[in-house]
């Protein structure tokens, strides 16, 4: 903590071992740090490359069920309840995951979560073999997208985060199954959020600032995310 560490993360690789996750939460809680997990059951994800459902079947793509994410979220929320540690769910995409987070918050578990702009504006109906839309977690169904938006409205979701994962055009210019997961996010996040959430009247500007700046700083325990005398001039 003194050296500047603000959180513990698996860096995009799910912590499949429940005991390891328990220990991480126990030790991180000693330093008031959250554990950020890429929630995904590797055995359920398998070699999938798109959300498991009608559109993946039509395109002949191997699917990743929403349960691959929500099962891990349910586990981590339970471990957070057991240990008293702070769980932060990264780039949530499944309505089942949202239900697990809401249930945990209702029980007083220290759990926060985030959603990406692309999971708020796109669905698996957009795929059509476009490798630029291959990401992990994958684009989900309309019902999942709508649940994420509602989670922002009712306060269940704490943060909008980019999950910025760019790749060179040559890396994406291959078959869908062979392309790397990842999509750009930094340069599109604010315009998308303003266009789809502010200008439609879905969220207020103050709520958007909270989701993009204030709450991320709070989750990480940083003196940032606002403009106040004597505080760091850092709102991102």
Pin down the residues of each PLM region:
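Histidine/acidic residue-rich metal-binding segments in metalloenzymes
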Residues: 1-160
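His/Asp/Glu-enriched, well-ordered alpha-helical/loop segment
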Residues: 58-86, 132, 153-154, 158-160, ...
